[in-house]
């Protein structure tokens, strides 16, 4: 946000905001701006536009609202945010909508672990930004789980940190 309280377009060492362009993208960006402004959050960093794939470590995750806030931030940056969900979420009449919203299904009933399933998901996509809450729960937890690291390492993608600073209401 600038001094007048308006959310500024991302700029700086990474250049412009991220990949998607077009009327629908701008509509989503506008909705994201309205949501972020309404709840009092602002963006404190630029998006690295030359990173087509990443694991985004999103912390802390202490509320269901954090997910919606991260989706709004992704809309502001014009990126599609992916997230892991159990495979049953993408089945049924609304499964297509869940998948379209960014869910990457994890099949828990197979012997293949989630890290390998995410590695395969990264391998089959041209771009993918997977948001992972390292706490593994919405409770305050100083001991992070390490799955995000293993996913990034096995997929050969960078880790990006997304920090929700509740004190200043700035996402960095």
Regions found by a protein language model. Give the residues of each.
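Extreme N-terminal tail/first-helix region
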Residues: 2-43
């Amino acid at each position: 946000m600038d001094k007048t309280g308006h959310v500024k377009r991302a700029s700086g060492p990474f250049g412009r905001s991220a990949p998607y362009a077009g009327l629908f993208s701008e509509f989503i960006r506008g909705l994201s701006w309205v949501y972020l402004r309404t709840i009092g959050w602002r963006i404190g960093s630029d998006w690295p536009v030359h990173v087509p794939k990443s694991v985004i470590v999103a912390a802390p995750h202490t509320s269901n609202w954090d997910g919606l806030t991260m989706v709004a931030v992704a809309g502001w940056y014009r990126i599609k945010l992916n997230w892991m969900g159990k495979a049953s979420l993408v089945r049924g009449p609304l499964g297509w909508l869940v998948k379209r919203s960014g869910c990457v299904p994890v099949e828990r009933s197979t012997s293949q672990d989630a890290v390998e399933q995410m590695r395969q998901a990264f391998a089959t996509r041209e771009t993918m930004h997977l948001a992972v809450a390292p706490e593994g729960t919405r409770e305050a937890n100083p001991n992070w789980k390490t799955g995000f690291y293993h996913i990034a390492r096995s997929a050969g993608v960078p880790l990006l940190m997304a920090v929700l600073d509740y004190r200043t209401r700035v996402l960095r």
